[in-house]
Regions:
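C-terminal catalytic/acceptor-binding lobe
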Residues: 160, 181-260
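Short, acidic, metal-binding catalytic loop of nucleotide-sugar glycosyltransferases
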Residues: 20-30
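Short beta-strand/loop segment that forms part of the nucleotide-sugar
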Residues: 30-39, 58-60
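A conserved acidic beta->alpha catalytic loop
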Residues: 36-46, 90-91
């Protein structure tokens, strides 16, 4: 089984776009959808009002930006042996799950490139499938410029590749998952990628660019991550496993699991 883990914090309209993409999937392998919720308001009610079903919602308290713990919680409750990490606000191809799964390889992350769309383009493609959305977005000069840059990255296949990815669950757990010491925006994915490559993992790049819908920038995140010092400490520690992770969570608050 495949577990598709979608990180969520409010912005239900963006989540709906991603869930609708997942509903359209053409996949020969059984998969589950897990929402990793960082303390959204009224999420279950909105899902029920919009008729969504067969979804597992794993929610923790809203105690600030805790993406690492949020994702680890989802993995703890997952049934699949292969994990695909996504965020809300993404538009993916109708065969996304199947084609990602077909590229699977032990000790390998399948890494996703994405193009962050303008507000105007995002409004035009809201509700469209991937192919139609790409057609509309291609009329945007900024989108075309970004895609040219992403195409170069695809050809170069850089060794370092933070961000969203897919991998075998057993490999993720072997590294003790994401480090939950990263509280606040930024660098948890860079640190995981650093450990992954330092201790025998490799990166494979998915061959299509995902679309990321516009949403207002959160000024509280700042330009430089508050986690820079912790990131440097962990990279210099020489440890394969996260300090606080899948097996030893950070924080005393319990998460809640609901099935709809």
């Amino acid at each position: 089984m495949i577990s598709v883990l979608i990180s969520v914090y409010n912005r239900f309209e963006g989540l709906r776009v991603t869930l609708d993409c997942i509903k359209r999937q053409q996949c020969n392998v059984e998969y589950e959808v897990i929402l990793c919720d960082d303390g959204s308001t009224g999420l279950i009610e909105r899902l029920n009002e919009n008729g969504y079903e067969d979804i597992t919602v794993v929610s923790q308290e809203d105690l600030g930006f805790r993406l690492s713990r949020n994702r680890n919680n989802g993995v703890r409750e997952s049934l699949g042996d292969f994990l695909i990490f996504l965020d809300q606000d993404f538009i993916v191809p109708d065969d996304f799950i199947q084609t990602v799964y077909d590229k699977r390889c032990e000790k390998s992350k399948i890494c996703f490139l994405y193009c962050y769309l303008s507000e105007e383009t995002s409004k035009k493609i809201n509700g469209l499938g991937y192919e139609s959305a790409c057609d509309v977005a291609s009329e945007d000069e900024e989108y075309k410029m970004k895609c040219r840059i992403l195409d170069m990255l695809l050809k170069q296949t850089p060794r370092r590749f933070p961000g969203l990815f897919a991998c075998y669950k057993k490999d993720f757990i072997e590294y003790n998952g994401f480090d939950e010491g990263f509280i606040g925006w930024g660098l948890e994915d860079f640190e995981f990628d650093f450990r992954w490559l330092e201790f025998g993992g490799r990166n494979i790049v998915y061959d299509r660019v995902l679309l990321h819908l516009f949403h207002p920038y959160d000024a509280s995140k700042g330009v430089i991550s508050v986690n820079t010092e912790y990131y440097n400490q962990r990279c210099n520690s020489g440890s394969k496993e996260s300090k606080y992770g899948f097996f030893n969570t950070l924080g005393e608050d319990e998460y809640e699991v609901k099935y709809i």
